Amino acid sequence: MAHARTTYFHNTVGGYHGAKPHRMQALYDYHLSKTISPNVVNMLNIKYTLQTAEDGSLTAGVNPSAFGNVWLVEEIISCSSADDEIQRLASEDLLRKALTTDNISQNQFALDSLSQISLVSHKANELKYRTTVSSTSFAVFSEMYYPHGWKSFINGEEVSHYRVNYALRGLLIPAGTHEILFRFEPDVIARGSRIRLAGYGIFSLIVLLFFVPLKRFGLKQ
C-alpha cells in the first residue's frame, strides 16, 4: 500500500504493483534489494531515497549523482550474455559507457561541449527529447526497454532503438539538431482500431443499403 501511495504522486523504482517486467525485477533483485549498487541507482535516475532514522522515522535523502533522464556516452561495450551485462553494471563507468548484448553498428563516439540532449515533455505514452550533436552519437535513456509497443522516431521518421544496460533504452543519433520521440503504439491496439473502424464502415453500409430502398419505396407509395 505504501508503494502504491508513493507511486500515485511520484515515479518510483518499485512501481505501484508487485508484478514487474522480468528484467526490471532481476535488476531490482540483483542491485537494489540487499546490496545497493550506486551505479544502478544513478542510471535509474533515482534522485531521492527514504532512509530510516534511529528513532524509526523516515527522512528523505537527496542523490546528487543521478544521471538524469538521458545522457550521451562515449563507448558501447559488447557483453557476452545478459548475465555478464547485469553483473558489469556495478563496476563500469555507466555515465561514459553503455553495456549491451545487441548488435550496434558503432561503438566509439566523440563528445564535445556542444553535444547535448534533454527531455522536453513527458506523458505516459509519449516522451519527447531535443538534442544537438556534432557527430554521430549514442544516447542512453533512463526508461525501461519494452519492444512490444514503444516505437522511436527522429524528426518524425521511425528508427530502431536498442536495449542497453540490461534494461534501458539506447539510440544512435546522427549529427545535427533533432527531435526524438518515443511513443507507445502497440500493434494489437492499432489492429483493434482498424477492425473497429472497418466494423463501423460495414454497419454504415448496411444501414444505407437497408434504409435507402425503404425510403424510395415510401416515396413511390
What are these regions, as identified by a protein language model?
Residues 47, 96-220:
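Active-site-proximal, structured, solvent-exposed surfaces of multi-pass membrane proteins
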Residues 1-130, 136-143, 150:
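Conserved luminal/periplasmic juxtamembrane motif of membrane-embedded glycan-processing enzymes
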